[in-house]
UniProtKB/Swiss-Prot annotation:
GO terms for cellular component: plasma membrane. Its EC number is 7.1.2.2. Component of the A-type ATP synthase that produces ATP from ADP in the presence of a proton gradient across the membrane. The A chain is the catalytic subunit. The keyword rRNA processing does not apply. This is A-type ATP synthase subunit A 2. It is an enzyme of class 7 (translocase). Has multiple subunits with at least A(3), B(3), C, D, E, F, H, I and proteolipid K(x). It comes from Methanospirillum hungatei JF-1 (strain ATCC 27890 / DSM 864 / NBRC 100397 / JF-1). Keywords: ATP synthesis, ATP-binding, Cell membrane, Hydrogen ion transport, Ion transport, Membrane, Nucleotide-binding, Translocase, Transport. One of its GO terms (molecular function) is proton-transporting ATPase activity, rotational mechanism. The lineage of its organism: Archaea, Methanobacteriati, Methanobacteriota, Stenosarchaea group, Methanomicrobia.
Amino acid sequence: MITGTIARISGPVITARNMTGSRMYDVVWVGRAALPGEIIRLEGDEAVIQVYEDTTGLMIHEPVENTGVPLSVELGPGLLASIYDGVQRPLPALYAKSGNYISRGIMVPGLDREKRWAFNPVKKAGEMVQTGDVLGTVQEFHLVHSIMVPPGVSGEIKTIASGEFTVTDVVCTLADGTEITMLQRWPVRKGRPFVKRLDPEVPLLTGQRVFDTMFPLVKGGTAMIPGGFGTGKTVSEQTLAKWADTQVVVYIGCGERGNEMTDVLTEFPELTDPRTGYPLIERTIMIANTSNMPVAAREASIYTGITIAEYYRDMGMDVALLADSTSRWGEALREVSGRLEEMPGEEGYPAYLATRLAAFYERAGRVICAGSEEKTGSVTIIGAVSPPGGDFSEPITQNTLRIAGTFWALDANLAYRRHYPSVNWIRSYSLYLEDVEDWFSEKVARDWYQFRGRAMYILQKEVELQEIVQLVGPDALPDKEKVVLEIAKIIREDFLQQSAYSDDDSFCPLEKQYWMLKIIIWYYDAIRAAMRRNVPLRQLLSIPARSEIARMKEQRDLDRLKRLSDIVWEQTENLEVQTCSTAA
């Protein structure tokens, strides 16, 4: 083991001498307190190390020990429903050791070494296996956890066990003597191997109308949620974590307030997944690196989360990774870069900011997993961005924009008007619309894309008309343009607006979304058809069905909702008859 000494201390960055033979990203123990750190630069016999603990009290000439291995995470049964810090130390175990505040230098393994798991083998002695093949399964809550052959390992099975084991017990031995346990270790900065990347063509359904219908995201895609203070980034991320159509959710609190992680911990055990009926906490893995924790560990928390997500992807599962927020990671990069005395880029961020962001987001994807059996899994990354003052021209927002396929722009003005989710429908976009068009046409309705396009046209037309209204008032507009304003208002208030705290409206099934939008567009068509027959606009906007349209989001009976479209046409037709008979 290489042992050096501390030569310089600058906040979370220290320089150690006599480190010849060390490699980049090796984990080291710093000082007599054995603080964990990672080598981020090598210069001659000196190593520059970022420390994942508070460096207060460290002194020059204290020892630095190189472990010789990169920063890695432990992968295996026991990850689900766990909460870790940025370097995969389980917070409940840290609390048991040190109380409310984490003491420095405490290292606890990521997976429980005492708990026993029932291992059911699916392979037999004499069979050939390769990287990614499933050796057996373990029941982890309601999910079947596959125990796979680790990357880089293959051969003939010599023995395979059955029964209850801890994660460190050997469950399989290969003919060449390789022993396989239920525990794998994998370096966080290196993506796990797969066979082939697939086209993103299956939408990630979230139960949120503005996301699913207007700006869809795909499984294996990337999305960003930028917004200023109070625009609803965290509530949006938590809503996606609750209702996303995935088997596993990895929620990373990167530099955010501790109360937000507390919300997740208190709410998720009480909420049930609408698709499985099981508590949401049983499919969630939380990584809490709150704002008062060391800044260097923010980068580690991001990489820890994506590595865990890739592990479940390799089992053939769909995984959603939610990072809240990547801006705090960027700020940590800026602080460490300043300590390293590197040449600053735009707004003080390091020149390699775009490279780091791209390397993270590119680990998303829908892939054919490694192994002889064909499995398809996906990792979808949704990153919140917190631009100072809501300024979308700042570097992190701009660099993420180049990478992300879906852009959900949160608007402070909408948030102040209590319109949630406060997604600005003019500034937001999705690059996946054409990819999911066939899926929606086959699974939902052939005219889904048409209705969505017409709704977007009405909303864009409203923005143009609002400029005229501000100058001359709404009464100066002709009736055909007043209709556009009224229907746009219905789309905004009765379709796009959705309460995260309503039992009836927090999750909206896709078929219900389609029928809600269809009824609104049909109402628009019915009004225009009746106006051509000289029916007064005032009467058309006050038909009894108008109040039913406003209450669609609370309507649980889909058949009753479908009948509403016929009621709309009947009531507008009856108005025409009444108008004609009155004129006669």
